[in-house]
């Protein structure tokens, strides 16, 4: 017997010579002497007649921070054919599925993935599901989830400005982006829509960062698009902003400035210009001071029941306070009968005559900014 590597000479011929035999367990080699055992193993895996399985996906299951312009790839254990059967996405995203190799399919979106959304991909299984070319199907439907990255504050501001919710314009500096990139920041510049805007308002603006102007504009957008007015840019907000029919505002941009300098007064600006000035008001007394700051109106009621405790410990219950625009906790612009106005008398609200409150109320919807200073 002669052993040459994995080749064994073992047969004694009848003539007294040796015959060459090759062990059946000897591996074969591919080009360059490389073993093709791994290739055969992969081929066996893809050609097996057992159930079809999902072996990989991109994004991976439970991935987070996925870019809004990402595609989706699914890899199977064997060659597959779509034959009109495709995975589904929830929430739905428009696009098409196509084969990219014998064992892989890819989703090409024609719209961006909605920021902040958790997307679920479901691959149909069973007899009516996606089938391998060898006839096998997934035993059951297979699903995986991934989280889309949060939307960017700068892009939120750009979109709100283009829909006229901000007191600024946004002018893009390049061509329109591909539709799948519309959730991403675009190059361009902001500019104030009116040169007469008061510095109390313009000083609040910071590009790319959350601020009172952006929060008020977002609440106005939510109101007009029938969403919860919580000033949070969640999935429904981004879905509406990036959808086919976001509702722009056609009204004026209004802003309220309350001065606690005696005599206390209110000015309402429309599109940068003072529309109503020196409206006499009352703010909170010393033990219930109306807080300084800028706040968006979050509740807008023709009549409101107000219940609380006065600074002296007595309780009040006013069932029908007219023309209330709440802007900071329990503080609201509203009408209230007083003998006179122009100095602190309230429990924290900004009071004015009922006639003045009725005149201003239609101009202070949810999202209107109210600045209190002095």
Set out the residue ranges of the language-model regions:
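Sec-exported extracytoplasmic/periplasmic mature domains
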Residues: 77, 81, 127-136, 158-166, ...
